[in-house]
Each structure stands twice: as C-alpha cells, then as structure tokens.
Curated annotation (Swiss-Prot):
Gene behind the chain: plsB
EC number(s) from the headed UniProt entry: 2.3.1.15
Pathway(s) of this molecule: Phospholipid metabolism; CDP-diacylglycerol biosynthesis; CDP-diacylglycerol from sn-glycerol 3-phosphate: step 1/3
Keywords: Acyltransferase, Cell inner membrane, Cell membrane, Lipid biosynthesis, Lipid metabolism, Membrane, Phospholipid biosynthesis, Phospholipid metabolism, Transferase
Pfam families linked to this entry: Acyltransferase, GPAT_C
Principal place of residence: membrane
Protein name (Swiss-Prot/TrEMBL): Glycerol-3-phosphate acyltransferase
GO molecular function terms noted in the UniProt entry: glycerol-3-phosphate O-acyltransferase activity
Family affiliation: Belongs to the GPAT/DAPAT family.
Swiss-Prot/TrEMBL domain comment: The HXXXXD motif is essential for acyltransferase activity and may constitute the binding site for the phosphate moiety of the glycerol-3-phosphate.
Membrane topology: Peripheral membrane protein
Matching PANTHER family: DIHYDROXYACETONE PHOSPHATE ACYLTRANSFERASE, GLYCEROL-3-PHOSPHATE ACYLTRANSFERASE
Amino acid sequence: MLALRSFFYLLLKFPLKLLVRCKIITDSQNITDQPNQPIFYIVRHQSASDLLALQSACKKQNLPDPLGKVTINGESFNRTLCLAKSTPLCSWRKSSKTTATAQGLALLNQHVIDENIDAKLIPANLIWGRTPTKERKNLNIGTLLADQESPNWLRKFFIVLFLGRDTLVRFSEAFSLRNISDNHGSDEAAAHKFLRVARFHFHRQTIAAKGPRLMHRKQMFTALFANPSVKRIISDEAKNKKVSEAEIKKKALVMMNEIAGDYSVSWLRFGEIILHWLWKRLYSAIKVSNAKVLRKLAQDGHEIIYVPCHRSHMDYLLLSYVILQEGLVMPRIAAGINLNFWPAGTIFRKGGAFFIRRSFGGNRLYSTIFREYLGLLFERGYGVKYYTEGGRSRTGRVLAPKTGMLAMTIQSLLRGIDRPLTLVPVYLGYEHVMEVGTYHKELSGSEKKGESMFGVLKAIKSLRNYGNGYVNFGEPMNINEFLNKQVPDWKDSIDPIDPQKPSWLTPTVNVLADQVMENINKSAALNGVALIALILHASKNKALSKLELETQLDFFLNIQRQAPFSEQLTIPEETGAELLTHVISLNKVTITEDSFGSLVSLSETANTEMRYYRNNILHTYVVPALVCRLLDKHSKINQDELVIKVQNVTALLKEDLYLYQDSTHVEQQTLRVLTVLKEMEIAKQTKAGFWSLSDDVGLLSQVHAMAECIDESLQRLAIITSLTSRLAPLSKRDLETKVVAIAKRLSVLNNINAPEFIDKRAQSTLIATIREQGYIDLDDDGLLIASSTMAEIKATVINLVDIEVLQSIAR
C-alpha cells in the first residue's frame, strides 16, 4: 500500500510542478534551532495535491519532508497530520475519518513516556487561489472554485487546474506538544481539543487571506436603498425639492455607481502579475516591516483599516501589492474622484477602489450615501484603506489629517458593529518619487494639472531605476479601545438605525487623527537618499567631500542604531560608503573630481527635489539634533538642564512634525544620545554632571552637521517668540502675517528654498502649539500676549539660533 501511494505521488509530481506555483509566507521562526527534536505538520485536507505542494514549499524553506516518517522511541509516525479527508464524489457515500486524532493521542502519550521529547507541530495552511465565496445560489465555475471545504477529487482537479498557480502556503508559528501534554493532559480529550483549535485556526486564516463573502454591486445598491438613513434622505430631498422620490432615487443610483467599487479577483490576479513584473524593473527591492502583526490582526477577526501616508500615486499600487504578497485579502480602497478617468477608473474599481469626491459641498444625499456605503463595507467585514491626509504630500512631510473618513468610521462603529475596528498606520517610503518635479512646480505657483491617460503614459515612458521602496506597518490602533479611554460611555451612543453624531465625536476624532499621523511617523524608514539629502542640506554649500559624507552617514546611522527614534523605525544595514554608492547609481547627486578627491553636491534642481526626501525623515532626528545644538552652543551644560531644554523645544515641534514622543520618551532618547556621543568620544561629562564637546575638530564637524538639521525649525520658533514678546498685544492673524513676512525674508537671506518654511498654515500650527504649551495668553480683548513663561522659552530658542538670524528678526 505504501509503495502504491509513493508511485501515485511520483506520477502526480510532474503535472503539479507545471500547474502549481506556491507563494510561501512563514510566521514560524528558528524551527530548526533544535535539530534533535521532531517536527510535525498539521494540514486541513488529506489530499495528494496538498501534500505534494507542501513538500515543495518545505523544500524551499529547508524544512523536513512532510511525506516522510518520524521515529520516536522506536515507534514510527507520519510527519503530517491531516484533519479531514476529501468528500466522496457520490453523495450517498460517507467520508471516512483521518488518523489525526489517533496520531495526536499517540504523540501526546510519547511526551508522557519520555520527558526529554518536545515535538513541534507546524500548522501549514494551503489556500488554492484567493477567490472568496459569493452570495449567489446558482452553480458556476466561480462558486465551484471558491468552495474549498473538503472538496471531492473532481472539484479538487478543477481547483488545481485553474487556481494552482495562485497557491498560498502559510506556515504558522509552531506550537509545542510538550506544552500541550504538560498543561492540558495527554488523553483523547486533549487530542480532540488541539485538533479543534487547529481547524478554527485554519478557518480564520483562510478568511483573512480570501475575505468574507463577496457582495456584488447590485446587491450593495439594493442594501443601500433599503437602509433607513438612505430612505429618509431620499424622502426629505423629494419633499424639499418638490420632485418625486423616483427622481431622487435616480440621482442616488448615479451617485452609487460613481462611488462603488466592482471587486474582481481575476483582475487582481492579473494586476498582481503585471505589478510583479513592473516592480522588478522599477525597484531594487521592496522592503516590508511588521507584516506579521498585520496577519495576526486579520486572523483574530479584526476589521483592518489601513491608513497610510500619501506620497505618490504609486502608493495605491505598492501597498495593495504588498498586502496581497503578505497573504491578506485586498482592502477596499478610497480613491480620489480625480483618478476616475478612462481606463484607470475601471481598472481601479476592479481592484477594489471606491471613489470619493474632494468635497461633499453640503450635498446631504451624497454624504449620506457615501457614509452608508462605507458602513456597509465595515458591516460585511471588508477591509478598507484610505488616506487621512486627503491628498499627496508635496513637501515630503506628513500633512495635517482630514478627519471626515475617520469620523464616518467611528459613526459606523456606533451602528453596533460587533468586530473590533483597528486602524493600521502605514509608512510608505521611496528613494524616488516620480511626481517630485511636478510637486515643486505646483509649490512654486504652477497650476495643478488633472490626471489623464496621457499623463500615465508619460509617466510610464520615464520609468527607470527607482531604488528601494519601503512599506512599514505601524502599531495597530484599536478604535474600540481608544474610545474606551477617551469616552468611557461611548457605547451609550450606539444606535443601529439612525447615524449618530454625539457631541464628543469631533474632538475625539481630532485626537485620533493626530495619533494616526504620529504613528505613521513613528514607523519611518531611513534610506540612503533621505539620509544624504538630510546631511547635504545641513552643509553650508550643499556639498561635502565623498569621504566626509561617508563619515557623516556612519555617524547619523550610528545614532539611530544605538539611540533610535522609535522601536518601529527601520534602519539600513549598509555602511555609509555602501549607501553613498547606491545613491550615486540613482543619479541623485553630482560627483565632481578635483586634485583633493571626489566632491558630492546637489545641482540646483536636485537641491529642491532632495529636500522632499529630507523631509521624509527629518522628524526622526529632532532629539539628536537638539542635543548636538545645545552642546555646540554651550561650552558646558548641566545634564538636567539639557534634558529640560530638549523636552521644552520638542514639545513645541510636536504638532508641526507629528512627533509621538512625550516628555518621558524625549528624556530617554536624550540620555541615550548623550551616551552614544560619550562612547564615540565626541562629548564628555564631568563628575558634577556637566556635558561639553571634545576638542577634536574632525569629530566636531559631525556634531555641527547633526545640529544644523534642526536649524530651520528653531528659526521659525525664534521668529514667533520674538515677535510675540515685542509686538503684543496683537491678533493671531496679524502675528501670522508678520511671521510669514520675516520667514520669507530669512528664506532669501539664507537661501532656504523650502515652501514649508514660509507656509502660513505651518506657522499657524506652531503658534497654536506655543499657545497650548502656555507661552502665549489672551488679554481681555482676545488679543495674543506673551505669558509669564514666554521669556524662558524665548531665551532657550534664541540661544540656539545664529546671531545673523536674530538680527534679521530684530529689524
């Protein structure tokens, strides 16, 4: 019998090799670290195609052969436990049970007999295709392939034939049979229990990869028209405009067609193939961080809402591709209506996009339909992705969040959704953004051009090596838990019929939106282009010798490796020299040779474009830069005083740069930075606790470069604190106008070509933060005046700014 099975598997291997292509995702780490301990697998189906596909995947992962045998204390065991046999083709025949329970019991008993055994059991889930089940009763090829629960051999033949090249093999974290035996017993009940847990585990995992039942557009429209809120708004609109409800329904249907996506798995599969081909030609690598947490969320039944930063139109494609590659279902994506042009609009809809207008413009019918459509997506269990910034950042810094989508998300929760809603901030980083040149023109006053097919073709024509792409999944934010802390009685506002807008909604959403942006920044990705942009913009003439730039890169990297901005920050493993070589290959810098060696500089065009990449990571160096500036400006400074000054200035920049750090985090990073500087012999500390810089001129240049990174922010603070102290009382509007005027003057004098430096909204944010920190008060007439603590913070700031800047402000 064994020989016959082996011969059968041998016959199947060749056709399966042609028909099956496995995408492997593993959560199991360091399984082979204990080579003397036996390894077993558990799978859903006792199927030859499943086992042979698993064998191929295990070979690629250097894992033991699942078709092999394991001998424990002289007793032989199959390495793979199968939970269910295939359903018989004839309905009157009953499916026999597998030996999984008996083998599980025998394995647990071996752990009772021999205390030295600690066998590992790896759940291996094989998912053929990513087609979710559909809400339709008629049998067709789609439903035939979608239903994979214990398929008979004929159904499995078609599944392998049509879906074999889109097979996902998911290795979960191995669990210890020793732990089960010691804590749950080794009887038949214990064996049944862990097999039951495995079945549930596979079910949740499959839902996470394929998604819930697919609802078609017409079904969604029917559900929306049956929604009480939509019914009410149609009735109200008909009465107010004195037309028939049928006419309003026609308008509503047009809006639904404009909004709704048209999700197609076949389109997604085709798009994934195209994108895989494209990324291989565009990017050296796509680096993904923290995806394991994401998979666990999906498997635990969370409603995942992706909230990425928005750098480029490429974001839509890159993040969607990565989500699919990580074995998760494609979310429904909120896209701007400007992307709904032929043929991109149709393609995006098939990929799961739904479209949103830039402004609802007081259109109650549209806003109601859109809100209820979003709520329906959540209710049906579909993941969603939207950009809280509302549009692409033109400066490289994250933008102030638009809160509309977040508000509608919480309103959906107030309809009584059972599953937890969890926001996943996503940091998207690039070493080349194809729109950067266009962004600079728009910031310089050029009119923004609308999207079109011509623009897409033009962009494709200019495709070249874009370096690396980065997708960092941030710390998940459970909205239910957030509301429990912010509004303990929020559940009192739940109403499954009428959409609620309680008084606490707006302020709570504002807090949540800020936390989202902070968590995006918390998960930043450092890269060679951004680091070189940061360092060269901190140099006097935007130029350094090649050797000096490599040294600076190593210093900047070392600071983050030993005193990181956050645990989520990703840092390149390469040396400074390796990063510079890579950036030179991307043509981002100009190399000039002279008798002394090579000079690295920025051309006039690159100077403005590289500022974009500098701004991507500037926030990660705020604390190290402030520490270096304080040491640079003081011959000696007490440690406690230094920490307080860093805390005070960082608090003023928190809203402007969306820093997640509170005073405790700032203190911890400050002390770590000081320790690193001491270990590098750049700074020294006396027994009395005073810090000062070393006398080594070569080392001091590194400190100067780091300190210069924060200079523009300090200049803006100096302008505001000086003008408030000197000109108060004055209105907020007058202060903003005067601050912008001086900022423009300084930008000319110091050659600061930075739109954010003179942006009125950015100055307004800084003024608001300074007021929130208690340095600005209001007089009886509602005008701004300096508070009693203004003098202290003003002194701190102006002592960190060059005298030439202060003279310009004083004039």
